[in-house]
């Protein structure tokens, strides 16, 4: 085999790849079908590793408080089984500059976008019309 085939010259061992570490995402979405599709899409198209999920505001805030450094991307739906995504935004106010918070909602009106951005979101995308923009946001360096 040769270097182009992915082996170290003369050793027969696979060469180490120098891929950037996968972005670690935590998902706050109560609809299992949407959540599963989102996780699959983020993994396949954006190289994102999902580290967990919550279906409620309280569950999300608890996990975020217990794992403050275990994520780089937080994806939040606004309407949850209990509580709201706006409450989750408040719960992650003490995050590092490298951590990004994205609201992904079916209700991304101008007013909702303003409220989410004022509440701490870095970006807001509509689930039904802005998935390409969402994925592009997730893959570009910040």
Regions found by a protein language model. Give the residues of each.
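Non-catalytic signal-transmission and effector/linker regions of two-component phosphorelay proteins
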Residues: 1-26, 32, 132-142
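Acidic, metal-coordinating helix/loop segments flanking the phosphotransfer/catalytic sites
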Residues: 53-73
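Acidic catalytic/metal-coordinating carboxylates
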Residues: 56, 84-87
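Active-site residues of response regulator receiver
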Residues: 77-79
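Short amphipathic alpha-helix used as the core "switch/output" element in two-component signaling
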Residues: 86-97
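Alpha4 helix (beta4-alpha4-beta5 surface) of REC/receiver domains from two-component response regulators
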Residues: 87, 108-125, 129
């Amino acid at each position: 085999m040769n270097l182009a085939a992915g082996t170290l010259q003369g050793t027969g061992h696979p060469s180490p790849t120098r891929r950037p570490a996968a972005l670690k995402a935590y998902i706050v979405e109560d609809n299992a079908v949407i959540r599963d599709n989102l996780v699959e899409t983020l993994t396949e198209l954006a190289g994102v590793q999902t580290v967990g999920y919550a279906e409620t505001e309280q569950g999300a805030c608890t996990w975020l408080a217990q794992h403050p450094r275990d994520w780089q991307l937080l994806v939040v739906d606004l309407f949850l089984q209990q509580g709201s995504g706006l409450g989750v935004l408040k719960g992650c106010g003490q995050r590092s500059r490298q951590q990004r918070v994205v609201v992904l909602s079916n209700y991304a009106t101008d007013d909702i976008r303003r409220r989410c951005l004022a509440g701490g979101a870095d970006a807001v995308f509509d689930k039904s019309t802005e998935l390409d923009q969402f994925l592009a946001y997730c893959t570009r360096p910040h």
